[in-house]
From Swiss-Prot:
Domain of life from the UniProt record: Bacteria
NCBIfam families, per the entry: PRK11469.1
Name of the protein described by the UniProt record: Putative manganese efflux pump MntP
Keyword Nucleus set for record: no
HAMAP family in alphabetical order: MntP_pump (MF_01521)
Topology versus the membrane: Multi-pass membrane protein
Homology family: Belongs to the MntP (TC 9.B.29) family.
Gene Ontology terms: cellular component: plasma membrane
Gene Ontology MF terms: manganese ion transmembrane transporter activity
Keywords linked to the UniProt accession: Cell inner membrane, Cell membrane, Ion transport, Manganese, Membrane, Transmembrane, Transmembrane helix, Transport
Pfam families referenced in this protein's UniProt entry, alphabetically: Mntp (PF02659)
InterPro entries according to UniProt: Mntp/YtaF, Put_MntP
Amino acid sequence: MNPVSLIFLAFAMSTDAFAAAIGKGSSLDRPRLSEALRTGIIFGVIEAITPLVGWLLGQAASQFVADWDHWIAFVLLVLLGLHMIHNGLRADHATEQEKPGQHSFWILAVTALATSIDALAVGVGLAFVDVNIFLAAGAIGLATMTMVTLGTMLGRALGAVTGKRAEMVGGVVLILVGATILYEHLSAA
């Protein structure tokens, strides 16, 4: 795989995570750069690990992954999105409920895993092409870290505009990302 293709692959793998990061950033109370970097690192590490795991699974598991990856991502993202919408609705009835300063590690890790399932499938495919898997995984992780950090900060700006509804907007974004993943896989079949 040539370097230009690798760069395009890395950024393509980061787009779902970028969209999710916008939602996550909008649901926080003015996230600082350190929180955006923390979010980016968590997403980047997970996004770098998943193609390695996929590569190790090889062709034997590729049919299972190809058949179910979109459903797994869809369900996880919809559940996380509904949870965020529920929290946003609950915040409307609470008096002076504050947004969190940061999301828990586990919420970020599950979101990152849900948005990186496609990278798992890509990793399986990379097992059959001439590519340094460690270089590819590193490029995917670095691109994702960068895009998620930027997405979190962009979400911060959107959160200031949307006010109390920011978490609901973030939930809708996650559901739309999940629906897009499902649609793309079903329409390609």
